[in-house]
Structure formats: C-alpha cells, structure tokens
Amino acid sequence: MRLIIVSGRSGSGKSTALDVLEDNGFYCIDNLPAGLLPQLAENALIHTELLQPKVAVSIDARNLPSHLSRFPELLAEARGRHIQCDVLFLDADEDTLLKRFSETRRRHPLTNADRSLAEAIRVESELLGPISDLADLKIDTTSLNLYQLRDSIKLRLLNQPEPGTAFLVESFGFKRGMPVDADLVFDVRCLPNPYWKPELREHSGLDQPVIDYLAAQPDVEEMFTDISTYLLKWLPRFAASNRAYVTIAIGCTGGHHRSVYITERLGQLLQQSLKNVQVRHRDL
C-alpha cells in the first residue's frame, strides 16, 4: 500500500493536489485528524478489501495543535506498519498567499476578529512546522498556475518508473526567485549570456543556435564538467541515505538560455547512471 500525506499552508494548492491524486486512482481523505494516521495505516492493512492500495490524505492547520505537534511520532508509527508513506508539503511566499485569498475572497481557517490574514498565515506556518520539517517532497507553488501545479505533482509523485530516490534537475531564473524546494542550487550567471546576442535572444537553451553558441564557450564546458563531476560523485550518496526526492536547481538570470542548456545536458548525463531522473524548466 502507498500512503501520501498532503499538507501545506492554506492557499498553496492542497485541494489541487488531492484532485490530481484522486484522478490517478488514489482514495482521498480531506482534513484527516492527524491523531488518526496510525489507525488509518493499520486499518488499510487489515481491511484491504475496503481500501484501495493507494490512499492520499490531507492534514492541515484545522487539526488540533496538540496533534500537529505530535506529527513526527504519528508518522513514525504509521511507517512502522511497513507502508510506503510519502509526505508532500506545498507552500508559496506570503505575498502570493495573501493575493490568492484576496482574489478568491475565501476566509482563512485561522482568521478571527482579533487575527488578520497575514497573522493567520504566520501562525499557520508555526503549526505546520513539524510536518514541513519531515516532508519528503516540497513544492513551491508561488510561480505555478493550476495546470503547472498539476503537472509538477504528476511529474514528481506519479511518474516514477522504479522505486528509489527520484531526482529532478530543474532550470530557473533568479529574477523570478529561487525554488524553495531545491536541495542543491548551482548559479551559472557567470557564464556568457546568449541574451546579449540579438540573433539568439528569442531562442532558448533547447534550440540549436543557443546550444552551438554555449557549447563553443570554454567556461561553459568547464562549469558543466565541475557540476557533473560533483553530482556523479554525491548523488548516489543521497540515494543510499534513503532520500525519497532530491531536486537540483540550475539558475541563470532569466531561466531561458544558460540554465536550460546546462540542465538538459546534466539530465541526459545523469540518466545514464541513475534511475528516476527527470528534467523540468520552470521558467520556459
């Protein structure tokens, strides 16, 4: 049986995540009391005819604070039933969460006459800290629309051909912020920038003219060699430590040229020696 626990601050996309999982064959339970997590795992093993082999639950700040603070021991108890259990934590920056609540006019579950929306969001962060700290996978939804979030969840959680650590190599642009879910970040802004070549500006790192230009730059090749040498040595150590997910982020200024080129090459190289390597370009 596989159990996915979905959590995150209100407005970060938990409902969308549950919808995606339900569409892909998961039996979904919204706002499960955290204290019932071990019982759910036990009943799922005993009554296999009643529950599907894939279950997803959301646990959020509507829980009792005492249950949320006990999440580490509750999770350990559930995993003690020998169930594959993944914790997905969704989040976005505070300005984005405020904007989403303003646009939808929904009420935050922790607001009241004495607590503003901004204060409720900060209180929620504290309450969900024990879950965030134990998340196997974190997805920053700040810059994602609904369709991108659905694709990201399917890519990271559902498209794993074999068990083991799932590696994601992701390009991004610093001007739109660093991905908060990255485990390793490499800054390639020091490399020659095709953006300043008028004939290359409208192309991306996926296009042959940009590929040819960057491949001819000695600094680019040296940077690629250094990064790939590091990753080939240390990523297997991540896998050996039973990490479920590892995200490697490659950043340039806009996320269109240098980071895309390096990310594509790294993905192709790592796929030759590691299982479950995926490539994503955040800002294309």
Swiss-Prot record:
Q: Which SUPFAM superfamilies match?
A: P-loop containing nucleoside triphosphate hydrolases
Where is ATP annotated to bind? G8, R9, S10, G11, S12, G13, K14, S15
Question: Keywords on this record?
Answer: ATP-binding, GTP-binding, Nucleotide-binding
Q: Tell me the organism.
A: Pseudomonas putida (strain W619)
Q: Does the keyword GTP-binding apply?
A: yes
Q: What is this protein called?
A: Nucleotide-binding protein PputW619_4266
What's an example of a GO molecular-function annotation for this chain? ATP binding
Positions binding GTP in this chain are D60, A61, R62, N63
Instruction: List the signal peptide residues.
Output: none
Family classification: Belongs to the RapZ-like family.
Gene3D superfamilies hit by this protein? P-loop containing nucleotide triphosphate hydrolases (3.40.50.300)
What does this protein's UniProt record list under function?
A: Displays ATPase and GTPase activities.
Q: Which NCBIfam families match?
A: PRK05416.1
Q: Which HAMAP family match?
A: RapZ_like
